Amino acid sequence: MTQPLLLASTSPFRKVLLDKFQYPFETANPNTDESSFSGESAEALVQRLAEQKAKACGNNYPEHLIIGSDQVCVINGKIIGKPHTVENACLQLKAASGQIVTFYTGLCLYNAKTGQSDVICEPFHVHFRQLTEQEIERYIEREMPLYCAGSFMCEGLGIALFNKLEGRDPNTLIGLPLIALREMLEKQGISIL
């Protein structure tokens, strides 16, 4: 019998992505501290947090394969998180205007039964077009992306902010690299097809 699957996330976007596999899973809140360490790279941060989230659910789900994921964006070498306020969202989008912004998504598949983790970092590049202040304000007013790294939702109106998207898996930008996850699940004996 295959192990049950758990998504260690309360994100409705990650849940919708994982639903694409048409494979049964549960969700749980990992309830972890997402602070970065001094000098920690974006890649190291998202991998550490993805694994931390997955392992945080291990005690309550000791028989499960647990999926953890975390994402940050980097603008001009600086790690940018969720804006939380309209003012911060405006600042983030002004900084992104005309730039190539890299999103790093950490993915962990933790086998709570064996204690083994498979952890990766998937980059994704977003080429922003030049944005006017009015476009930024209208976008934020219409979509309110205050809990999204980088202050946009590409699955919605955010697509109008870009010239080009570049990466292995477009799902990565929304927060869950499904191509990499399928590969990890296959190593654990779970076939999606």
Curated annotation (Swiss-Prot):
Keywords: Cytoplasm, Hydrolase, Nucleotide metabolism. It catalyses: N(7)-methyl-GTP + H2O = N(7)-methyl-GMP + diphosphate + H(+). The record marks F13, Q71, E155 as: Important for substrate specificity. Its EC number is 3.6.1.-. It is found in: Cytoplasm. GO terms for cellular component: cytoplasm. GO terms for molecular function: nucleoside triphosphate diphosphatase activity. It is an enzyme of class 3 (hydrolase). InterPro entries: ITPase-like_fam, Maf-like. The keyword Cytoplasm applies. This is 7-methyl-GTP pyrophosphatase. The lineage of its organism: Bacteria, Pseudomonadati, Pseudomonadota, Gammaproteobacteria, Vibrionales.
